[in-house]
């Protein structure tokens, strides 16, 4: 932009001193054209260096159907808060299996940053054993939890391994605890489910350490009931906070 500003000043000087020799005017015109080409190349270079962020996962990102018509989804918040380019591959309802089967193959090769938020639906499919009325020891419950999380762990690590094959920055989002206390379906296991959420997040942090990628802790972002559109989906407010966290990360890496 500085070069464009200089070009404008050059033109002003040319108009003010129009009585200069023709040869000087021609040299000034040639210099102006050169500076114009330089400024154009600079603008094109800036566009090439623009962040291109791919968003993978589930409804934590693909939350458009859960916000009001006048409200913004996570992707819309991202686009409103920055000039970066965003490619949403995340799909409401998807699991780690779906990311492996449907999302990875669609990754743009030009992605400079990748954000992954997955695992919540996998967890929802497994926590119903906590509703079991049979009496189990703490040891038995923990053993069941570990067994149920094992295949999720394997798939999650495979996803991150595949993401790491491309030369780009990676951000893994943890799974938040949700607003389960206000939901009749989950209220009776709201506290017990936090243990499984913590176990899944341990997998995420461990995977991040293995592949040397970053983590965004969603439990520090979704902190109030207003952050949720329902017990488990981000609201307009929560989505805005998530978008801010993602943009801060893009700027920092």
Locations of the language-model features?
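Alpha-helical cap/lid subdomain in secreted, periplasmic
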Residues: 104-236, 240-253
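Low-complexity, intrinsically disordered Ser/Thr/Pro- and acidic-rich segments
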Residues: 34-40
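Intrinsic-disorder-associated, low-complexity terminal segments enriched in Asp/Asn/His/Tyr and depleted
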Residues: 19, 26, 34, 46-49
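Serine-esterase "nucleophile elbow" of acetyl-processing enzymes
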Residues: 43-94, 104-110
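Short, solvent-exposed loop/turn segments at secondary-structure boundaries
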Residues: 65-69, 99-101, 228-231
